[in-house]
């Protein structure tokens, strides 16, 4: 299942993916091989989960929603499978010691087993420096795909570059 948490579905997405995926409401517990569930309006909605679900987080708020629910259940219903967290930035740093800072930070410190996948060695090193611990962690170095790289090389002739430092 793909659960969309940040935006509503648009017709273009439905047109593109409807041959391969079944689009379901979050409260629909029917099982299909591939489903997409829009949950951007999740404040008053529920999501059926099972012991076969694995959650992959791509932002702290996606992690927080699921981790908090498992904590609220207190182990009465289901214990989660290991969480998988794609970490692309140090997200608490966007929130300047606020309550959002603490919420973002808490998702890295969950008591549940969690696999961290970092998008750079530098980011992984920073998390190690801050003392975050994960069940397992992996690092990949993102690369520019061949099509964009080819296009970028042609643009160098047309774009004037200058080095700039921003201090705030």
List each model region and its residues.
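N-terminal pre-catalytic "stem/leader" segment of glycosyltransferase-like enzymes
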Residues: 1-51
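A short, active-site helix/loop in glycosyltransferases that binds the activated sugar's phosphate group
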Residues: 65-66, 94-96, 100, 112-137
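Membrane-proximal helix-turn-helix segments that form the acceptor-binding/catalytic region
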Residues: 44-51, 77, 98-117
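Conserved donor-binding/catalytic core segment of Leloir-type glycosyltransferases
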Residues: 117, 157-168
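Short N-terminal targeting/anchoring amphipathic segment
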Residues: 45-65
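Nucleotide-sugar donor phosphate/pyrophosphate-binding loop at the beta->alpha transition
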Residues: 39-40, 91-108, 146
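Short beta-strand->alpha-helix junction loop in the catalytic core
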Residues: 89-91, 122, 139-150
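Active-site proximal beta-strand in glycosyltransferases
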Residues: 54-56, 73-93
